[in-house]
Amino acid sequence: MAFGDAWKQLSWFYYQYLLVTALYMLEPWERTIFNSLLISVAAMAVYTGYVFMPQHIMAILHYFEVVQ
C-alpha cells in the first residue's frame, strides 16, 4: 500500500513539473532532450559547488581573520 501511495505522489509531482514548465506540449523526444540538458546543468552546478565552495569559504574566513 505504501508503494502505491508513493508512486501516486511521485506521478503527481511529475505531472506538476510538466505543467509548470509547459513540457506537456513537447513531443517525447523533445522532452527527453530538455530533461537531459536540465539534469546536466544541475549536475555541473552541484559539482562546481562541491569543488570550489570550500576554497571560497576558506578565503572568506581568512579575510575576516576567523582562521589564520
UniProtKB/Swiss-Prot annotation:
Cysteines joined through disulfide linkages: none
GO biological process assignments: ceramide biosynthetic process
Chain ranges on the Cytoplasmic side, renumbered to this chain: 1-9, 55-68
Pathway: Lipid metabolism; sphingolipid metabolism
One Pfam family cited in the UniProt record for this chain: SPT_ssu-like
GO CC terms: endoplasmic reticulum membrane; serine palmitoyltransferase complex
Main localization, broad class: endoplasmic reticulum
Transmembrane region(s): 10-26, 32-54
Residues at the site labelled Within the serine palmitoyltransferase (SPT) complex, defines the length of the acyl chain-binding pocket, determining the acyl-CoA substrate preference: 25
Mode of membrane association: Multi-pass membrane protein
Location in or out of the cell: Endoplasmic reticulum membrane
Keywords recorded for this protein, A-Z: Endoplasmic reticulum, Lipid metabolism, Membrane, Sphingolipid metabolism, Transmembrane, Transmembrane helix
Ranges facing Lumenal side: 27-31
Protein task: Component of the serine palmitoyltransferase multisubunit enzyme (SPT) that catalyzes the initial and rate-limiting step in sphingolipid biosynthesis by condensing L-serine and activated acyl-CoA (most commonly palmitoyl-CoA) to form long-chain bases. The SPT complex is composed of SPTLC1, SPTLC2 or SPTLC3 and SPTSSA or SPTSSB. Within this complex, the heterodimer consisting of SPTLC1 and SPTLC2/SPTLC3 forms the catalytic core. Within the SPT complex, SPTSSA stimulates the catalytic activity and plays a role in substrate specificity, which depends upon the overall complex composition.
Quaternary data: Component of the serine palmitoyltransferase (SPT) complex, which is composed of SPTLC1, SPTLC2 or SPTLC3 and SPTSSA or SPTSSB. The heterodimer consisting of SPTLC1 and SPTLC2/SPTLC3 forms the catalytic core of the enzyme, while SPTSSA or SPTSSB subunits determine substrate specificity. SPT also interacts with ORMDL proteins, especially ORMDL3, which negatively regulate SPT activity in the presence of ceramides.
Family (UniProt): Belongs to the SPTSS family. SPTSSA subfamily.
Protein name: Serine palmitoyltransferase small subunit A
Organism of origin: Danio rerio (Zebrafish)
